[in-house]
Swiss-Prot record:
Protein name: Probable Fe(2+)-trafficking protein
One Pfam family in the UniProt entry: Iron_traffic
Organism: Polynucleobacter asymbioticus (strain DSM 18221 / CIP 109841 / QLW-P1DMWA-1) (Polynucleobacter necessarius subsp. asymbioticus)
Iron recorded as keyword: yes
Domain of life per record: Bacteria
Family: Belongs to the Fe(2+)-trafficking protein family.
SUPFAM superfamilies recorded: YggX-like (SSF111148)
Species classification: Bacteria, Pseudomonadati, Pseudomonadota, Betaproteobacteria, Burkholderiales
Amino acid sequence: MARMVQCIKLNKEAEGMDFAPLPGELGKKIWNQVSKEAWAAWLKQQTMLINENRLNMADPRARQYLLKQVEKYFFEGGADMAQGYVPEAE
């Protein structure tokens, strides 16, 4: 049976992740409050930020930037968008 969470991003009960995606308190908070579906959406957002901003993941500043963005994405109303990004029409 899948673990269910009340997803803070989707505002509904959904399947939770199997393990914390990040270490520390932020990882625990995400594991408890974010669904697999919402995490997959974040990974797409993160990929756009890395590519559009040409982030070097070996640079500690780039990793810190993404940690701040993931926290903003789920818990503070939204992360930065890639410049020029236009969401697909539904």
